[in-house]
Amino acid sequence: MKELVYLIYAAVFFYAAAVFFMIMKKNRGAYFSIAAGFIVYSAFIALRGWLSGFFTTYGIFEGVFFMPWVMGFIVIFLSAYSKDKEDALTAVIPLFCFSLFAAFYPKGIIPPTPNKLTIWADLFFITEPFGHACFYLGGWYAALSIVKKRKTADYHSLLVWGFVFFSISQVTGAVWAFLGWGSPFRWGARHFQSAVIWCYYAAYLHIRFLKGWTDLRKMLYAASGAVVVALCTFGSHLKEMGFPRIGG
């Protein structure tokens, strides 16, 4: 358990260093600090799979911890291959914030129930954080575009990919819910929150075809989406902090 704590703290330290280098316009230092943090964070994620005494994917793909890993992967990719590398690096700020939240979150895993021991649950827990990470980063780059009064990193592509991943998570989640509870949809907060997120971004994909929707309006809508996702997910995260856990 101590090893996990040291690893995630080290990753957060590297991300904090990357923020410093980015502010100081030391882009090379920022990039390598992000890469170092990502490597350490990957080790943290891998070790979580063994917290219960035997390997379980649920320890790896818990959203609070897996989503920053996905975000780190995307930021590294964009910082290396995007046309706007300097703008892409600014996303280390939300990466640092989400990793810091994970560092202070209970590190143990919630004991997996029988209805979670299915490939459909794994597919859901993998694709949903990918969707959330794309939504957050797309919102960040949209907000950056508003501040700089020009389109920065391609926030639209991130939101499209986020919608694809999130839609897959809803389908796999529905299959998992049917196998585990006998219904593809449960009348609970978790499912309604997912419905809100899906409808919000489904609307985003269509408003760009409406007359009168300027680029600024689209950016504002895209940036606001990150707030919608946060409001719909952090309630569940805070609630689950009180759940009994294995390993701390």
Predicted segments — roles?
Residues 117-127:
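Surface-exposed beta-loop interaction hotspot
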Residues 2-109, 126-180, 189-248:
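Hydrophobic cores of alpha-helical transmembrane segments in multi-pass integral membrane proteins
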